Amino acid sequence: MDLTDTQQAILQLIAERIESEGAPPSQTEIARAFGFKGVRAAQYHLEALEQAGAIRRIPGQARGIRLVQAPPLEKLAEPGLPDNVLRLPVLGRVAAGLPIGADIGSDDFVVLDRVFFSPAPDYLLKVQGDSMIDEGIFDGDLIGVHRTRDAHSGQIVVARIDDEITVKLLKIAKDRIRLLPRNPDYKPIEVLPDQDFSIEGLYCGLLRPNR
C-alpha cells in the first residue's frame, strides 16, 4: 500500500476514532484535525485511500468510511527500529505569534526517540514566530502534538480559531477562553463567542533542528 505520510496519518485517525468512539470521523472532522482549509483536501486524501484499497466509502452517508484493513495502532513505531523510536509526519506550520492560516499537508517525516516527548505525539508542526520563547519554544522548532480535543487551563495547546492555528498557553475562566503568549511583546488572544474555536492537540515536547 503506497501511501503518503499524511494519508497514513489520516488512516490512523480513522482507525483510532472507530476504536474509541465506534464511528469514523466525518470529512469535516478530518479537515479540522489536519488543518485543511476545507473538506476538499480531506476528500482528495480519502479518494487516494480508497483507490489504494485501505478504505471503502459508502455514498450518501456522512460517516460512511469503512476500513478494509485496519492499520496497527502502534503505527508510529518505525519498522525495523527499536520500540522507543517514532516516525512522525511533519504536517506543516503553527504560529507562535499571531495566528496564521493553516498550512498542513507536508509529507516530510522525522525519525526520533520517544524520550523527547510526553505523552507520545501523533505528529510534528514547525513553529513560526517567537511568542512562546519563555517556554523555550523558538522559531523553527519542531513541536510534538498529541491529538486530543480535551485540554485543561494552564496547558500549552495547539488551537484553531476559525481557519487559523496557533500554539499558546490555554487559560479558561468561567465562560472566558484566552490563549496566552509566553513573550511580553505579544498580547493575549481572547476567543470571541462567534468564533469557531477548537483544541487540535496538546504540546508534548520539541526538537530543535540544526540551523
Swiss-Prot record:
- Protein name as it appears in the record: LexA repressor
Q: What is the uppermost EC class here?
A: hydrolase
**What are its GO biological-process terms?**
DNA repair; DNA replication; negative regulation of DNA-templated transcription; proteolysis; SOS response
Lineage of source species: Bacteria, Pseudomonadati, Pseudomonadota, Gammaproteobacteria, Lysobacterales
Q: Provide the reaction this enzyme catalyses.
A: Hydrolysis of Ala-|-Gly bond in repressor LexA
The task this protein performs is described as: Represses a number of genes involved in the response to DNA damage (SOS response), including recA and lexA. In the presence of single-stranded DNA, RecA interacts with LexA causing an autocatalytic cleavage which disrupts the DNA-binding part of LexA, leading to derepression of the SOS regulon and eventually DNA repair.
The entry's DNA-binding region:
27-47
Named from the GO MF annotations, one term is: serine-type endopeptidase activity
Active-site residues, Swiss-Prot/TrEMBL: S131, K168
What is the species of this protein?
Stenotrophomonas maltophilia (strain R551-3)
Which HAMAP family does the UniProt record give?
LexA
- Assembly and partners? Homodimer.
Give the site residues for Cleavage: A96, G97
The entry assigns this protein to a family as follows: Belongs to the peptidase S24 family.
What keywords were assigned to this record?
Autocatalytic cleavage, DNA damage, DNA repair, DNA replication, DNA-binding, Hydrolase, Repressor, SOS response, Transcription, Transcription regulation
EC number of this enzyme: 3.4.21.88
InterPro entries membership? LexA, LexA-like, LexA/Signal_pep-like_sf, LexA_DNA-bd_dom, LexA_repressor, Peptidase_S24_LexA, Peptidase_S24_S26A/B/C, WH-like_DNA-bd_sf
